[in-house]
Amino acid sequence: VSGTYTEYEIGQEEITDGFGTGMCFTVTRSGENLPSVIQRFFLYEGKDYFLTDVALSDEKGVETNYLRPISTEPDTRCDILGKGDNRVLIVPFDNDKWVRYRSSDLRGGVNSFEVSAVYNADTRRGIVIGSVEHDTWKSGVRIESDEPGIISRLELYTGASGEGTRDVLPHGKVKGKTVRSPKTFFGYFEDWRDGMEEFGRACATIAPPLPWNLGTPFGWNSWAKMEFRLSYEKVLEVSDFFKENLQNNNFENNGIVYIGMDAGWAKMSDEQLADI
């Protein structure tokens, strides 16, 4: 697509925001009867990462369900991790269907959601890549390797949809005069685990945690023991145990202990649920 664009413009400005002080570089590509492609790069003093986003802009309006703020060229051969046990962190989109975080050999192709890390387990050096804005898009990370230790494809894309996101339809299209991807985090770290901590702080800079000045809720979830065997009678037994053994032994918060009824609660009647 970039080959159809004939004009390029690069701008820069000093910035100061929640991430610190730095520079924003903007690359704008334009062409006749084409929406402008605007990519911004945010670089901050003292940070081992940069942020970037990409946008399509047209006064007549644009719509898309797919953007790639970071993507390698098709013939990429990257061995930045060096020799060793090179691996990929796979992050699930949610916690449904018993899905887990896991580490995979850097071979073939893998998909992660919202964030991933490609790292050398022997040296701990690695790349962390992920979206730090989560209000509009579902994003994915695609990593491929056709040779041990070599990254042949690395991209973060918006519009992730499929079994991993529990979707059966394509991602919805985002419309407007300007459609922008989420800001994307990319950094190389001596220890990829420190990079993941930095990624978390970057997310919290954009969307700070909500304040909570009260106690920590104390409770029990039924799945750990009962799984699908949850029943009205079992819930009452647990409630009695809480009252007789926990609440009077300081296993509580302000005198309250919660019961989280997981899979199986729908088998109870409305009357039983109201009684509980």
How would you label these PLM feature ranges?
Residues 21, 50, 180-182, 216, ...:
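Residues that flank catalytic or metal-binding motifs in active/ligand-binding sites
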Residues 34, 61-65, 76, 190-193, ...:
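Intrinsically disordered, low-complexity acidic/polar segments
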Residues 36-39, 52-53, 163-168, 204-205, ...:
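Short alpha-helical segments and helix-capping/turn motifs at coil-helix boundaries
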Residues 42, 51-57, 180-182, 219-221, ...:
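Residues within well-ordered beta-strands of beta-sheet-rich folds
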Residues 44, 210, 225-228:
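Short, charged/polar micro-motifs that form catalytic or ligand-binding hotspots
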